[in-house]
Amino acid sequence: MGIFFISLVLIVLASVVFFVGGFFLGRYFLERIGTTKILEAEERAVQIVQEAQKEANEYKELKVSEVNQEWKKKRREFDQEVVIKNNKFNQMQKQVLQKEGQLKKQSQDLRDMERKLQDQRKEIEQTMETVNLRSSELERITLEQNQRLESISNLQADEARQMLVDNMLAKAREEATETIHQIHEEAEQQAERLAEKTLLTAIQRISFEQATENALSVVHIQSDELKGRIIGREGRNIKAFENATGVDIIVDDTPEVVILSCFDPLRRELAKLTLQKLLVDGIIHPVAIEKAYEDAKKEIDDVIMSAGEETISSLQIPDMPAEVVGLIGKMKYHTVYGQNLLQHSREVAMLAGLMASELKLDARVAKRAALLHDIGLVLPESDEPHAIAGRNFLKKFNESAVVLNAVAAHHGDVVKESPIAELVDAANVISLSRPGARGAVTADGNVKRLESLEEIAKGFPGVLKTYALQAGREIRVIVEGDNVSDSQADVLAHDIARKIESEVQYPGQIKVSIIRERRSIAYAK
């Protein structure tokens, strides 16, 4: 019993000692662990702060770099703008100096003319004094002659006076005739000098680049592989393209180039736009060709209107009707003696306007009449001369009588009724007289021959379109499939060929091709 109690006490004491020791030992380890955690947290905090500072510094450097780059960019733009402004200022300063020099020269010329006039006035006064002296001397001599005549011939004073007057009148008439002739010669010389000065001033103040129009357009392609797609299976794409546009398409060995050939610049430009659209889409077949052609026609209408608006804007011609503006733009695709008709009309307008300014006439009216003088060339075919057709067309838009007369008279079809008409005619002659202009008459004659071939074929019933191809060696006729049968197509080809033989002179032979196509369309609903 006593041993058990002692053992129990020992166990309790051991437990108390173990518990107390464990408590202090645990507290010790907890304090150590807490201290370690705190140190780690502090180190982590320091690390986070350092990383944040590093990121902040990097962000700051990035933003500073961006700001510096933006500042440098703005600085470069500012420097460039300053250079441009300085160049413009220097150019304007040069122009001002030139104008100042011109004004000084004109002022000096005026002073010289004033001195000359003063000298001439003095000479005239001296001449008048001499004339008065001679008149007095003449009266004295006349009196002496009268006295001598009376004493010698026993004539009455009135009779002698009449004889003397007749002699003096005859001599005066002779001198007056010589003076009038001299005045006429001087007036003609002054008029020639003034006209020469006016023309030289006008010509020197304008400059136009002119090039003879040819019948070819070049379309660049990305690779020669596209040529096969342009040709199509058994050439069907080329045939569809030529039928739609009326333009020859030439695919040869020239790398990355396709050539379009046609005498009509407008038709050739339409074909060029059509081919470019097909190349962009990458899909080439007959239906796509027709769609691209229709899209090109809409686009060319916008181009024509833009060309007309740009022309009247550059010439500062106000209040031009929209229909007339469209015809002016259409001049871009016509030629006259090898010159582009729009460029020719602009050149004539500039010349006429400058000459009108030199002669103190209305420059705006002169430019308006000159720009419109060849508008008859872009009107539908007419039996009237193009000058008369242009005048009659412009009458519908209430153009002024001066403009109408200048348009109608520039080829001598009617009498010129104003100085403006003379200026327009002169400017037209100057423009067409440039070196090489008249050398293109043969080309224009060729175009007329091709147009006559197309007109002959169009005169037959059932014909939709006609195209003269291969420099006039082939006339391709597209007919209505529903109205012209196969047998009628053969007869039509024969009739067209016979009419061409009787009305057109040409070397070699002309092939007449009739194309008859019939389409059946149905819609599934």
From Swiss-Prot:
Keywords: Cell membrane, Endonuclease, Hydrolase, Membrane, Nuclease, RNA-binding, Transmembrane, Transmembrane helix
Domain HD: 341-433
One cellular component term from this protein's GO annotations in UniProt: plasma membrane
PROSITE patterns in the cross-refs: HD (PS51831), KH_TYPE_1 (PS50084)
Gene3D superfamilies named among the record's database cross-references: Hypothetical protein af1432 (1.10.3210.10), K Homology domain, type 1 (3.30.1370.10)
Membrane-related topology note: Single-pass membrane protein
Keyword tRNA-binding: no
Keyword ATP-binding appears in the UniProt entry: no
E.C. designation(s): 3.1.-.-
Gene Ontology annotations of biological process type: mRNA catabolic process
Domain of life: Bacteria
Similarity comment: Belongs to the RNase Y family.
Annotated function: Endoribonuclease that initiates mRNA decay.
The protein, known as: Ribonuclease Y
Organism: Chlorobium phaeobacteroides (strain DSM 266 / SMG 266 / 2430)
Lineage: Bacteria, Pseudomonadati, Chlorobiota, Chlorobiia, Chlorobiales
